[in-house]
Amino acid sequence: MNAIWIAVAAVSLLALAFGAILGYASRRFAVEDDPVVEKIDEILPQSQCGQCGYPGCRPYAEAISCNGEKINRCAPGGEAVMLKIAELLNVEPQPLDGEAQELTPARMVAVIDENNCIGCTKCIQACPVDAIVGATRAMHTVMSDLCTGCNLCVDPCPTHCISLQPVAETPDSWKWDLNTIPVRIIPVEHHA
């Protein structure tokens, strides 16, 4: 019985020693992240869609901060994100790059024609936000609440059963453009 307690104590002491060494090393050799990259990454929409030409939002933020990449390449974020980044970096706003120049693009969502889906899982592997569910050789479907409309699942599909369709506007999804609605003050009469 003493041998078991000695072994437990030895392993515990080793774990404590290695933990202390790793803790010291993580603080001693820590690499400071660029605070500008952190702030830009917080502004970006985190859709990880790759439409900017980078594999995700963090690499795009690093390219903006370190390599002087254009600030206008985030299609999902649109003009609002570009303006926030321009303000943060104190640079001139730029017109949106490429297809993102539409002022109010309709939100798109991937739709799978489930009758033609062969269950190859290529779309699941391509989706950066895990919005597609299904199993091998079984029907797949898209969870529209999670889909960012990034278009990355369309090309890998061998049966071409995936398409992007605009999301229908409902009272729940309607966004009022309060800057274009004419507003006037109506005087109120007080009656005694």
Swiss-Prot record:
What the record notes about the co-factor is: Binds 3 [4Fe-4S] clusters.
Please tell me where [4Fe-4S] cluster 1 binds in this chain. C49, C52, C57, C74
| Entry-linked Gene3D superfamilies | 3.30.70.20, Electron transport complex subunit B, putative Fe-S cluster
Cite the 4Fe-4S ferredoxin-type domain residue spans from the record. 108-137, 138-167
Keywords attached to this Swiss-Prot or TrEMBL record, sorted alphabetically, are: 4Fe-4S, Cell inner membrane, Cell membrane, Electron transport, Iron, Iron-sulfur, Membrane, Metal-binding, Repeat, Translocase, Transport
**Does the record's keyword annotation contain Glycosyltransferase?**
no
Which family does the record assign? Belongs to the 4Fe4S bacterial-type ferredoxin family. RnfB subfamily.
Q: What is this protein's function?
A: Part of a membrane-bound complex that couples electron transfer with translocation of ions across the membrane. Required to maintain the reduced state of SoxR.
Q: What is this protein called?
A: Ion-translocating oxidoreductase complex subunit B
